[in-house]
């Protein structure tokens, strides 16, 4: 008589639990985050490639067949790689292949087409989180891990897998913030040379992020904040060598960030305004800016220009992320009560670290939300938000708090958990829309 092995329910749950520990284990963050990243990206990739046909908009096919009648193109022979070339990525790919040929292509970050990088911002975000909140206690490790995991399922969705600027911007901006936070920690231990070198390195990365996406210029708030911190010392003690040298490093860092915006504009000015042809209208502006001109002319971007009735659905689509950005910015101002949750047994390391940086990041994130609401195509905030870590920390802290409360109150519904589920569902739905070249962009 043959023997049949039957797994008990408890054995099945143990196997599932073991699998869960492999996938989500804050004690092994690098491995766990890499596995989660691979699984989520594979799912997004699968959803996009199974979308049938050329898509609602057939502009992508012009990259491959610029002179052919699209009715002759067999969708089955359409390269899978071009399924990721949708919306603005058509401009990125064309500029990467041929350079900046058309005026409107200058609306898309000059830095991106000159440097294509793999997305590593998830792991950098984990290290940044450790710098801010510490990584000594189980609660701190969980917060840092969850924050990085949330970055994987960012509402940017398919844009982080396609030839768009969001992935590289996230990497550069978060890496810049990591070096900036390391500079702050060195300042606390009086390592001045290391502090200044890391501050300048952070400025270089944020400047590169600005060359990829113009909203990176908001990183200059960090340096403006640092400069203002020097004023009380100057007023109370007067100028000293230490204060002057510190202020010089801060101002130099701010100028480096400004170069990320100014250099592409200078290159465009030479290309369009210093020729024998009739100069473009923007060449005569007090501060010539091809970026501002093409945004206004070709995309109708400007203060309250997007506030028209047909765009109401797009505002509704953006509202959850806008609310999350503003709510988490306000959360960061409640610094003592927030960081004390992660300072156990009288330890104040997390409080000291977060006190230096969270309010500054709150200013940046709040400015981004206000600009998106008043002056951008508002729906792009769903992807712009991917490069700003504050809301990841807020949502991770809420998940931890809700889980703790559910254990004591037997409450099953968690608003933070529902928010995470909504982000994941949105990411999958957006992958379908993206693969079919359907809005929103």
Curated annotation (Swiss-Prot):
Its EC number is 2.4.1.-. It is found in: Endoplasmic reticulum membrane. It holds the Pfam family Mannosyl_trans2. InterPro entries: PIG-V/Gpi18. It is an enzyme of class 2 (transferase). One of its GO terms (molecular function) is alpha-1,6-mannosyltransferase activity. It comes from the Eukaryota. GO terms for cellular component: endoplasmic reticulum membrane; mannosyltransferase complex. Pathway: Glycolipid biosynthesis; glycosylphosphatidylinositol-anchor biosynthesis. One of its GO terms (biological process) is GPI anchor biosynthetic process. The chain crosses the membrane at residues 4-24, 35-55, 115-135, 143-163, 165-185, 199-223, 249-269, 306-326, 361-381, 418-438. It is a multi-pass membrane protein. Keywords: Endoplasmic reticulum, Glycosyltransferase, GPI-anchor biosynthesis, Membrane, Transferase, Transmembrane, Transmembrane helix. Mannosyltransferase involved in glycosylphosphatidylinositol-anchor biosynthesis. Transfers the second mannose to the glycosylphosphatidylinositol during GPI precursor assembly. Belongs to the PIGV family. This is GPI mannosyltransferase 2. It comes from Aspergillus fumigatus (strain ATCC MYA-4609 / CBS 101355 / FGSC A1100 / Af293) (Neosartorya fumigata).
């Amino acid at each position: 008589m043959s023997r049949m092995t039957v797994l008990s329910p408890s054995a099945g749950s143990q196997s599932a639990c073991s699998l869960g520990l492999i996938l989500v284990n804050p004690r092994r963050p690098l491995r766990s985050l890499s596995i989660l990243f691979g699984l989520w990206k594979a799912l997004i990739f699968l959803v996009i490639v199974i979308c049938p046909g050329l898509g609602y908009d057939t502009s992508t096919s012009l990259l491959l067949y610029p002179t052919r009648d699209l009715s002759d193109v067999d969708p089955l022979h359409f390269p899978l790689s071009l399924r990721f070339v949708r919306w603005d990525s058509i401009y990125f790919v064309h500029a990467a292949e041929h350079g900046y040929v058309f005026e409107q292509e200058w609306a898309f970050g000059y830095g991106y087409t000159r440097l294509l990088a793999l997305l590593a911002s998830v792991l950098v975000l984990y290290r940044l989180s450790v710098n801010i909140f510490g990584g000594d206690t189980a609660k701190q490790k969980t917060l840092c891990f969850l924050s990085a995991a949330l970055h994987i399922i960012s509402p940017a969705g398919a844009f982080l897998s396609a030839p768009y600027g969001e992935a590289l911007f996230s990497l550069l901006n978060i890496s810049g913030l990591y070096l900036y936070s390391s500079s702050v920690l060195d300042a606390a231990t009086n390592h001045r040379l290391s502090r200044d070198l890391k501050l300048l390195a952070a400025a270089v990365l944020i400047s590169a992020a600005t060359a990829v996406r113009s909203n990176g210029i908001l990183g200059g708030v960090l340096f403006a904040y640092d400069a203002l911190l020097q004023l009380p010392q100057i007023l109370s003690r007067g100028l000293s060598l230490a204060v002057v040298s510190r202020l010089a490093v801060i101002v130099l860092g701010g100028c480096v960030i400004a170069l990320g915006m100014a250099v592409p504009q200078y290159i465009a000015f030479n290309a369009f305004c210093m020729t024998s042809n009739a100069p473009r209208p923007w060449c005569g502006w007090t501060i010539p800016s091809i970026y501002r001109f093409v945004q206004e002319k070709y995309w109708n971007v400007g203060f309250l220009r997007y506030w028209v009735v047909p765009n109401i659905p797009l505002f509704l689509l953006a509202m959850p992320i806008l609310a999350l950005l503003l709510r988490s910015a306000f959360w960061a101002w409640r610094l003592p009560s927030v960081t004390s949750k992660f300072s156990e047994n009288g330890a104040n390391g997390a409080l000291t670290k977060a006190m230096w940086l969270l309010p500054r990041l709150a200013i940046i994130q709040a400015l981004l939300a206000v600009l998106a609401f008043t002056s951008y195509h508002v729906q792009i905030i769903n992807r712009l938000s991917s490069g700003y870590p504050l809301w990841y920390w807020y949502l991770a802290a809420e998940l931890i708090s809700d889980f703790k409360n559910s254990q004591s109150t037997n409450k099953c519904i968690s608003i933070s958990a529902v928010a995470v589920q909504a982000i994941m569902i949105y990411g999958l739905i957006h992958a379908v829309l993206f693969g079919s070249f359907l809005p929103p962009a």
